Amino acid sequence: MIAIQGATYIYPGSTVPALEKIDLAIEPGEFLAITGPNGSGKSTLARLLNGLLRPRQGRVLVDGMDTGDDTALITIRRRVGMVFQDPDNQLVAATVAEDVAFGLENLGLPPAEIEKRVDLALRSVGLEDLAARPPHLLSGGQKQRLALAGVLAMEPRYLVLDEATAMLDPVAREEILEQVLRLRQEQGIAIILITHLMEEAVRADRMLIMKSGRIFWQGSPRELSYQERILAAAGLRLPAVIALAKSLRQGGIKLATNPVCVEELARALWKLASRE
């Protein structure tokens, strides 16, 4: 479990807390989405999770290890993998396979173990046929999948995606999200999704809204998505699917469920059409 206890963070040169008195527990295997407007503190919170930033007050514990303990940082950063918005900042080698192997080589693992992990990681993101390709020749979506493979090769227990799909087109964005959800199901990795896209956030088990460096709301996305006042107060909008479902109801179409994604809306409409 990742436990954040009374964490406050102030950036150097500032007097205004970027995060203030944050208390949060992230369970192994869960899918947590953290959203909020720009400047709300969500990316700062992401960087606390593996010790890239350390709280000015309070503490962050990863499976009982304190991120303030220098001797625990290497282990913590292996447990909590991070994928950022711009994949080019995480790609360092001449070929796809070498890039995935880079972090493993720094751990001093045997060559056979490195080869095994690289192969498994590339297969898990669908890049096994591109192992010898230079990273700069990949598309944006492929680069992000490569960055993800490099993190997965380290065998993390928690995977933090910090706006990792923000620079991708809708098709590539959906591919990345689907792969991450599949990995969670197959390997039990906890997913912490930092996003400003409500369409992504509502797919999580639990959603947390940040506002002005504090936790403004947390709970079930399905519960939140039909409370427009909470969303408006946080500077967020209804996801497109939920807005469409609302319009359909206002037009007299009685849906049996409250869909939060395209697949759920399609099923609800199919059931409605089948009854008629």
Swiss-Prot record:
In the Enzyme Commission scheme, what number(s) does this protein have? 7.-.-.-
Q: Where in the cell is it found?
A: Cell membrane
Q: Does the keyword Transport apply?
A: yes
Gene3D superfamilies linked to this entry: P-loop containing nucleotide triphosphate hydrolases
Query: What GO molecular functions are on record for this protein?
Result: ATP binding; ATP hydrolysis activity; ATPase-coupled transmembrane transporter activity
Give the UniProt keywords, A-Z.
ATP-binding, Cell membrane, Membrane, Nucleotide-binding, Translocase, Transport
Q: How does it sit in the membrane?
A: Peripheral membrane protein
Question: Which of this chain's residues are annotated to bind ATP?
Answer: 36-43
Gene Ontology cellular-component terms for this entry are:
ATP-binding cassette (ABC) transporter complex
Give the ABC transporter domain ranges: 2-237
Record flagged with keyword Zinc-finger: no
InterPro entries according to UniProt: AAA+_ATPase (IPR003593), ABC_transporter-like_ATP-bd (IPR003439), ABC_transporter-like_CS (IPR017871), ABC_transpr_CbiO/EcfA_su (IPR015856), ECF_ABC_transporter_ATP-bd (IPR050095), EcfA_1 (IPR030947), P-loop_NTPase (IPR027417)
Pfam name, any one: ABC_tran
Q: How does it assemble?
A: Forms a stable energy-coupling factor (ECF) transporter complex composed of 2 membrane-embedded substrate-binding proteins (S component), 2 ATP-binding proteins (A component) and 2 transmembrane proteins (T component).
Q: Which PANTHER family match?
A: ENERGY-COUPLING FACTOR TRANSPORTER ATP-BINDING PROTEIN ECFA1 (PTHR43553:SF24), HEAVY METAL TRANSPORTER (PTHR43553)
The UniProt similarity line reads: Belongs to the ABC transporter superfamily. Energy-coupling factor EcfA family.
Q: What does this protein do?
A: ATP-binding (A) component of a common energy-coupling factor (ECF) ABC-transporter complex. Unlike classic ABC transporters this ECF transporter provides the energy necessary to transport a number of different substrates.
Name of this chain's protein: Energy-coupling factor transporter ATP-binding protein EcfA
Species annotation: Moorella thermoacetica (strain ATCC 39073 / JCM 9320)
Q: What does UniProt list as this organism's lineage?
A: Bacteria, Bacillati, Bacillota, Clostridia, Moorellales
